[in-house]
Swiss-Prot record:
Keywords: Endoplasmic reticulum, Heme, Iron, Membrane, Metal-binding, Microsome, Monooxygenase, Oxidoreductase. The gene is Cyp4p1. Its main location: endoplasmic reticulum. This is Cytochrome P450 4p1. The lineage of its organism: Eukaryota, Metazoa, Ecdysozoa, Arthropoda, Hexapoda. GO terms for cellular component: endoplasmic reticulum membrane. Gene3D superfamilies: Cytochrome P450. Belongs to the cytochrome P450 family. One of its GO terms (molecular function) is iron ion binding.
């Protein structure tokens, strides 16, 4: 009789699981499914990726190294051929590789919150402009947007030029030199972001800047370790088993940013003591402020932000302004070395518009360098600094294609794959700056190219980044040819917080005569 009751109970359980599985992906730890309103199979819009275990896609990344994590998404994109669905550890994930879906998500009012993976960055960046949401994000965005106004960028240009010239001093007296870009470019971009956005020169803090970069790499290593192991997704388990080196690296980078803030406070102290009202009609600092950090310090005086908030934004701006821009420059110089004909076109354009003494190298002159801009845009198409972006549905949300995302669903926008989608790009693996000529852009989907994101959460520093990259390219190409020093076929990409390679990229500089 007991056996009969057990059989009946098991049968009832299996029947219930079968019924429940229509709404939940049971084996993926009761994940609420993505569905269509009329109940038709969701696969007609977005195929479901088969996991390598019975637990959906939960363990698909387990045990993969950095290259394996990166290649997983590339393999999935090729296999599925369109945007697709995964079920991972209690969460539905909508993976986007087409421009239409990207446009819908990046402009959807319900999809402003960053995805859960960004929570792994909270110990580092806390909830600054990159990771915050809701009213806090709106307030910080409104506060910081004026600090990247074109009038402010014009003031930064002299710093970009000076830092670019200082960058070349390390090669003085050398007619030929092979350089490792990952060793020299990040130092340049860190110096630039600290002097422009923070108002602090790193000349006397060079060693501390190097330690910052080293420990940033350690933070990134921990981020990938956590991403690829579901057992470490919970904060408690991560803190118990894998956070020791993470904590020490955090201490170094936070002490560095705190010292930057303290130095700038000292420089502004006299002015703050003497100042009267510095806010505009909206209660925010005047657009005439020189540095972003100045804006934050004055906003603190007016009660609009506290010290922790300043730390959040400084850590965020230093990360985004130093790391993502350095990646653009590294791959930009690599592409110069691999495409000598394109490099020559850039050089001839520079010679036509820019004097050799660089005394008049201002934003107006940079804006004349159209082909150089196309070159850098093509670089960021093939090698976007941020290859994926994430969003979370904080409430049930219907997309334009009919998919209904349950509350808590994750959305991953695969920028790397959208940028190489043959639907939008002819011979997508080929490097062709001419793709960005006006006549070639006008009929292309606007969201087929989103290296700086798009919509209401687009990157406020995209003009800053392009201006900095173009300035260094001008100063360098005036003096050097950039020659090939690596085999591009041997490049192995890694997943990081941003786009990485297994081996450091090198180029050869040959002085022009």
């Amino acid at each position: 009789m007991i056996i009969l009751w057990l059989i009946l109970a098991l049968s009832a359980l299996l029947y219930w699981l079968h019924r429940a599985n229509k709404d939940y992906h049971i084996l993926s730890f009761f994940t609420k499914r993505i569905r269509l309103k009329d109940g038709t199979p969701v696969e007609i819009i977005a195929p479901i990726a088969k996991g390598k275990t019975i637990f959906g896609n939960t363990l698909d990344l387990y045990g993969r190294d950095h290259a394996g994590v990166f290649n997983y998404s590339r393999e999935r994109a090729k296999e599925m051929g369109t945007s697709y669905i995964e079920y991972v550890f209690g969460k539905a994930i909508y993976n986007i590789i087409d421009a239409d879906s990207a446009e819908n998500v990046l402009n959807h009012p319900n999809l402003i919150t960053k995805g859960l993976v960004y929570n792994f960055l909270h110990p580092f960046l806390r909830t600054g402009l990159l990771t915050s949401t809701g009213k806090k994000w709106h307030a910080r965005r409104k506060m910081l947007t004026p600090t990247f106004h074109f009038n402010i960028l014009n003031q930064f240009q002299e710093i970009f030029k000076t830092e670019s010239q200082k960058f070349l001093l390390q090669f003085e007296g050398q007619d030929e030199v092979t350089i490792t870009l990952h060793d020299v470019i990040p130092r340049f971009t860190l110096n630039s972001i600290c002097e422009t956005a923070m108002g602090v020169k790193l000349d006397e803090m060079a060693e501390k800047g190097d330690r910052y970069r080293e420990n940033f790499s350690q933070i990134e290593e921990c981020f990938i370790r956590r991403l690829s192991n579901p057992l470490l997704w919970g904060d408690k388990l991560f803190e118990m088993f894998a956070a020791k080196d993470f904590a020490s690296a955090l201490d170094v980078v936070h002490r560095f940013s705190s010292e930057i803030i303290a130095k700038r406070r000292d420089l502004l102290k006299d002015e703050l003591d003497k100042s009267s009202s510095t806010a505009d009609d909206d209660g925010f600092v005047s657009k005439k402020r020189f540095a972003m950090l100045d804006t934050l310090i004055y906003a603190e005086k007016d009660g609009l932000i506290d010290h922790i908030g300043i730390c959040e934004e400084v850590d965020t701006l230093m990360f985004e302004g130093y790391d993502t821009t350095s990646i653009g420059l590294i791959f930009g110089l690599m592409n110069m070395s691999l495409n000598p004909d394109k490099q020559e076109l850039c050089y001839q354009e520079i010679q036509e518009h820019i004097d050799d003494d660089l005394s008049n190298l201002d934003v107006g002159q940079l804006n004349k360098l159209k082909y150089l801009e196309y070159f850098m845009k093509e670089t960021t198409r093939l090698f976007p600094s941020v290859p994926i972006m994430g969003r979370e549905a904080v409430q049930e949300t219907e997309l334009a294609n009919g998919l209904i995302l349950p509350k808590g669903a994750q959305i991953t926008i695969h920028v790397f794959d959208i940028h190489r989608n043959a639907k939008y790009w002819d011979s997508p693996e080929e490097f062709r700056p001419e793709r960005f000529l006006p006549e070639n852009v006008q009929d292309r989907h606007t969201y087929a190219y989103v290296p700086f994101s798009a919509g209401q959460r687009n990157c406020i520093g995209k003009k800053y980044a392009m201006q900095e990259m173009k300035t260094l390219m001008v100063v360098l190409l005036k003096q050097f040819k950039v020659l090939k020093a690596i085999d591009p076929q041997k490049i192995v990409f890694h997943t990081g917080i941003t786009l990485r390679t297994q081996d450091k990229i090198r180029v050869k500089l040959v002085r022009r005569t």
